[in-house]
C-alpha cells in the first residue's frame, strides 16, 4: 500500500494551512487525527506548534490522535511526551503486528518486541493512550503457535489502553512479503 508513496515530513506551516481551511469548512470539530504518517517523528517543538494551534482554534476539540512508531516514541523523553499530552495529544495508534521476535524479523518490522513494549508503557505513563494492533495469521502455518503465545504475553506486558486484532488470510500461493 505504501510502496508507491514516498514518505516526507510536511512543514508545520502546511499543516496549519490545512487546519485553517478545516476551521472555515467545519463548524464543530471534536476529533482531529494527524494522519498520513507518524507525526511523532517530528521534533517536539514542531508538533507542539500544531497542537497549540488546534488548542487555540478548535476549542471544542476533545481528542487529537496520530499514528506512531515505537522508535519515535522512544526518542522522546517522558517530559516531552507529557508536554504533548498537556497540549491535547490523547492517543497514539501503533501497529505491533506480533509479539514474536521471529515474526517481527520475518516481516521486516524494524522494531523489536522490547521496543514495542517499552514505547507503549512510556506513552501510557505519560498519560497518552496507546491503541495497539496485532495481526492474526501474520506468522503463517510454521510460526502460528509462537505468534499467538508471544502476542498474548506481550499484551500482558504492555499497559495499552486498547488492543485490537486484524486478521490476515492469504490465498495460496500469495507471498507474505
What are the residue ranges of the model-derived segments?
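A short, flexible beta-alpha/helix-coil linker loop
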Residues: 2-5, 39, 99-101, 136-139
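Conserved C-terminal portion of the radical SAM core fold
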Residues: 34, 91, 114-175
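Short, solvent-exposed loop/turn segments at secondary-structure boundaries
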Residues: 7-10, 43-45, 105-108, 142-146
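Canonical Radical SAM [4Fe-4S] cluster-binding loop centered on the CxxxCxxC motif
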Residues: 1-17
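Conserved SAM/AdoMet-binding glycine-rich loop
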Residues: 23-125, 129
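Short acidic, glycine/proline-rich loop/turn micro-motifs
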Residues: 2, 103-106, 175-176
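Aromatic/hydrophobic pocket-lining residues that form the small-molecule binding cavity
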Residues: 12-15, 47, 77, 116, ...
Amino acid at each position: 500500500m505504501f510502496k508507491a508513496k514516498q514518505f516526507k515530513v510536511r512543514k508545520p506551516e502546511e499543516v496549519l494551512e490545512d487546519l485553517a481551511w478545516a476551521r472555515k469548512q467545519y463548524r464543530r470539530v471534536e476529533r482531529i487525527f494527524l494522519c498520513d504518517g507518524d507525526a511523532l517523528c517530528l521534533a517536539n517543538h514542531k508538533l507542539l506548534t500544531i497542537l497549540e494551534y488546534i488548542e487555540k482554534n478548535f476549542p471544542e476539540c476533545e481528542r487529537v490522535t496520530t499514528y506512531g512508531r515505537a522508535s519515535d516514541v522512544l526518542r522522546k523523553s517522558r517530559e516531552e511526551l507529557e508536554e504533548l499530552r498537556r497540549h491535547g495529544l490523547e492517543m497514539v495508534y501503533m501497529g505491533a503486528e506480533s509479539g514474536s521476535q521471529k515474526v517481527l524479523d520475518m516481516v521486516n518490522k524494524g522494531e523489536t518486541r522490547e521496543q514495542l513494549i517499552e514505547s507503549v508503557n512510556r506513552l501510557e505513563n505519560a498519560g497518552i493512550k496507546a491503541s495497539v494492533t496485532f495481526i492474526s495469521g501474520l506468522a503463517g502455518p510454521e510460526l502460528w503457535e509462537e505468534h499467538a503465545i508471544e502476542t498474548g504475553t506481550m499484551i500482558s506486558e504492555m499497559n495499552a489502553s486498547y488492543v485490537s486484532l486484524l486478521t490476515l488470510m492469504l490465498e495460496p500461493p500469495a507471498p507474505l512479503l
